[in-house]
Amino acid sequence: MFDTHTVEIEWAGRPLKLETGKIARQADGAVLATYGETVVLATVVSAKAPKPGQDFFPLTVNYQEKTYAAGKIPGGYFKREGRPSENETLVSRLIDRPIRPLFPEGYKNDTQVVVTVVQHDLENNPDILSMIASSAALTLSGVPFMGPVGGARVGYINGEYVLNPHLDEMDESSLDLVVAGTYDAVLMVESEAKELPEDVMLGAVMFGHKGFQPVLDAIIKLAEVAAKEPRDFQPEDYSELEGEMLKHFEAELREAYKITQKADRYAAVDAVKAKVKAHFLPEEGEAKYTAEEVGAIFKHLQAKIVRWNILDTKSRIDGRDLETVRPIVSEVGLLPRTHGSALFTRGETQAIVVATLGTGEDEQYVDSLTGMYKERFLLHYNFPPFSVGETGRMGSPGRREIGHGKLAWRAIRPMLPSAEQFPYTLRVVSEITESNGSSSMATVCGTSLALMDAGVPLAKPVAGIAMGLILEGDRFAVLSDILGDEDHLGDMDFKVAGTADGITSLQMDIKIAGITEEIMKVALGQAKGGRAHILGEMAKAITESRGQLGEFAPRIEVMNIPVDKIREVIGSGGKVIREIVEKTGAKINIEDDGTVKIASSSGKEIEAARKWIHSIVAEPEIGQIYEGTVVKTADFGAFVNFFGARDGLVHISQLASERVAKTTDVVKEGDKVWVKLLGFDERGKVRLSMKVVDQATGQEIPNEKKKEEAAE
């Protein structure tokens, strides 16, 4: 019934198996991939023809994690998987980025890649396996795809590169780098690092590229026996239209791109575009080309002219040379009632960034396949349409916003203080108010400034820069601090963030094959100089974290209590902790290890809560005298609350030096009394005495002390 084909190799010390022909046979391509004991299913379906009027390539990648893969049942009321998690969105982008440039220009058929994690061994991260399975499914599908693509994760542990480290090994690694590409070229890099130098980062990229070569061989081997017939796709030849357009409008378009101000330049380009449409799409008579074709070739022509200008003149759209960074203005304390704020402006890209400090209650609980964990650093990036002078949808963040926020998060996280050093939950929000390229790197710079303004002790300031590339044959130009147009019309988007001493985050997306190690080395070196310049400009606003928190930020005091005392502090059903919170006004968070965090904007509230908790957990000392309150009387004595929440019994024989017939003859409920702690009985119950203490002065009575000692 099944025409199954399997290829298996040993890769980085674990078996990698690719299987097709048994599952999801109605998809154009389907591969069940296993690495260790982690299993994913990747499927590809591409429409047989493009939709009428389609002028772009509609590629969708959906990565989904099923909780059954890790033997779990989803939380929530409905008990089933819902909207994609942040991690699912990020992995979807990770798969999308290296495969998108390998579809031929002009292919516009609706294409969907769906990757499902069906088993997780809690050792091997499914993201790399998902990239490989997607590439294999595309290679088998017959869809026009210039693959295959391979991918690998690289760690850096004890000064050595490690290929595909296990999940638990990543805790020891100073690098988490994912690289993807073909036999000859690197197409995508995503990484987080602990201040590593440029040569180590470049070495990791090349190590990963070499490391996934056996995977490409395995995909080709599977394709040789299981690939479908390639679809007949011939891109349209528009060389005649392009030649005509160049002949009539090249000079005008070149002049338009000499205008350095964005709005004026766009207006001039639009004017040329209107002339192009009037020329090739006349209102009377039959047009030789469609509006979509004319629009597409005009875009292509724009790219060519910008690229030629840069390579020929070494001058860019806005008049800068290749290495100059746009003018930078940094401000902090922009919003004084927030905990920390900054305005970072670089050319026509601008971000308002606000930092907020919270307590342990504000940590984000993340339910992943590997288990529940808490995240104390949150970074949210918002890109409203007005930032580019447009109208558009407002609402929940899209994939791009989630991805850009995570890139900035990776850049900043290595410089954050530990929870022990700084026991706050941190949330940073970046509001992009203007954008003309590199808004994610503006977010990195603004976040660093806002956190320092908030008094968060960052190890070092962090800055980011976006690099671009123009490559034509043997000629290339690496561009520092790219504009939006240079991003769209160039061959590479290369974002580097870090401190003056090393890289903390690196992201690279390459739109063409053939980026060499030499070009990456030049780009990294040029980015280092640009990053140093930006850090210098940021230092004009603030050089290090403020010595104290902002006026409106909460204060947190940390104390430790014995684990066996946690129940007493919380109380039955939370009664005690609720009372402390209600009466002091402080927020209290108690960890399982006995760490107690008390938070409030008022020092008095913190101190009141601290003393209350201390009174509960502290142990009274035998022989000490305490002031207490009678809380209950009985025939055999009185119960006195004498130490925090601790009560003890004053036996009727210990109420007074003379014989007492009735407890209430000496004390009544609510009376203030002085008691001495005599000790504990065999059951741990407290034994108190009033008769050895002068009830007027609270001092011990010498004669009674001698009698007590003699009796003992």
Swiss-Prot record:
As recorded in Swiss-Prot or TrEMBL, the protein's gene is named pnp
Q: Which part of the chain is the S1 motif domain?
A: 623-691
- UniProt GO cellular component terms: cytosol
Q: What is its EC number?
A: 2.7.7.8
Where Mg(2+) binds, per the record, is at 487, 493
Compartments, as annotated in UniProt: Cytoplasm
Task: Report the PROSITE patterns cross-referenced here.
Answer: KH_TYPE_1, S1
The top EC class, named as a word, is transferase
SMART domains given for it?
A: KH (SM00322), S1 (SM00316)
> Which function does this protein serve?
Involved in mRNA degradation. Catalyzes the phosphorolysis of single-stranded polyribonucleotides processively in the 3'- to 5'-direction.
User: Could you state a single Gene Ontology molecular function term?
Assistant: 3'-5'-RNA exonuclease activity
Give the cofactors, semicolon-separated. Answer: Mg(2+)
Q: What is this protein called?
A: Polyribonucleotide nucleotidyltransferase
Q: What is the lineage of its organism?
A: Bacteria, Pseudomonadati, Pseudomonadota, Alphaproteobacteria, Hyphomicrobiales
Q: Which InterPro entries match?
A: ExoRNase_PH_dom1, ExoRNase_PH_dom2, ExoRNase_PH_dom2_sf, KH_dom, KH_dom_type_1, KH_dom_type_1_sf, NA-bd_OB-fold, PNPase
What family is reported?
Belongs to the polyribonucleotide nucleotidyltransferase family.
This enzyme catalyses: RNA(n+1) + phosphate = RNA(n) + a ribonucleoside 5'-diphosphate
Name any Gene Ontology BP term.
mRNA catabolic process
